[in-house]
């Protein structure tokens, strides 16, 4: 009787070892987990080491406008000839962030998603658009930059700076919940709205044009040095709850 029990134990252990070896198999092997958390190509695993940085570039033809929605990471917009060009750089640890893009109604829509509680996790976008392309960007956490854009711009982040440089847009909106907002124009704009919840706001326009300026700060200095005319059809609204507000020529 004792010898039978010993044999039974040996058989049970052998069976357990077989199951473990199956679970350790590669893709498609018995026991492989195809529905579990995403594993970074850098060799990370849930709760494990950093997956690294993964850049990816592509071009999109036929789009006439750009709309970017990014949960965590920076967005930089530049201007150039040819079709729209996108470079996504992913930085992640145990879980790789998801990205997707599609052209819908003539608008290229880019979406960068998060990784739950896994860190690090961000998607940095660099997008080159043709001249006169309207641009909309929304970021939860990260910097937003637009350089030389001549189409309308609507840029916003919950946390981070927003910078527009050498803008040729007639209409521009730049917003940050927590961070500086800077807008510099190469040509006189028709309407500018620059807003920060916590941070400095600076708007710089070419000399020689008068504006209806509405500048306000909750806590901080207010400095307006552009020609002002309340009846002007050109309007600049610059506000912050905490920080300095400057509207100037340059």
Where are these regions (language model features)?
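Short linear S-[DN]-x-LW-Φ motif typified by the pepsin-like aspartic protease active-site region
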Residues: 3-6, 10, 23-104, 128, ...
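C-terminal motif of bacterial Sec signal peptides marking the signal peptidase cleavage site
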Residues: 18-21
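Short, T/G/N/S-enriched strand-turn elements that build extracellular solenoid repeat scaffolds
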Residues: 55-57, 74-79, 98-100, 124-128, ...
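Short, surface-exposed interaction patches in beta-rich subdomains
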Residues: 165-250
């Amino acid at each position: 009787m004792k010898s039978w029990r010993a044999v039974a134990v040996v058989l049970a252990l052998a069976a357990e070892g077989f199951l473990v070896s199956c679970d350790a198999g590669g893709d498609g092997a018995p026991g492989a987990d195809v529905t579990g958390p995403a594993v970074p190509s850098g060799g990370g695993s849930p709760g494990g080491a950093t997956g690294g940085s993964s850049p990816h570039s592509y071009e999109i033809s036929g789009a006439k406008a750009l709309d970017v929605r990014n949960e965590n990471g920076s967005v930089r917009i530049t201007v150039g000839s040819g079709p729209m060009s996108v470079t996504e750089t992913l930085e992640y640890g145990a879980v790789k962030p998801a990205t997707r893009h599609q052209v819908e109604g003539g608008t290229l829509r880019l979406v960068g998603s998060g990784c739950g509680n896994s860190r690090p996790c961000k998607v940095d976008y660099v997008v080159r658009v043709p001249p006169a392309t309207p641009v909309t960007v929304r970021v939860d956490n990260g910097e937003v930059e637009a350089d030389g854009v001549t189409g309308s711009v609507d840029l916003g982040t919950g946390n981070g700076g927003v910078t527009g440089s050498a803008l040729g847009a007639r209409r521009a909106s730049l917003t940050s919940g927590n961070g500086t907002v800077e807008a510099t124009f190469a040509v006189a704009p028709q309407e500018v709205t620059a807003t920060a919840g916590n941070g400095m706001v600076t708007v710089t326009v070419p000399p020689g044009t008068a504006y209806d300026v509405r500048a306000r700060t909750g806590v901080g200095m207010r400095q307006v040095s552009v020609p002002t005319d309340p009846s002007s059809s050109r309007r600049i609204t610059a506000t912050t709850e905490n920080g300095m507000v400057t509207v100037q020529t340059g």
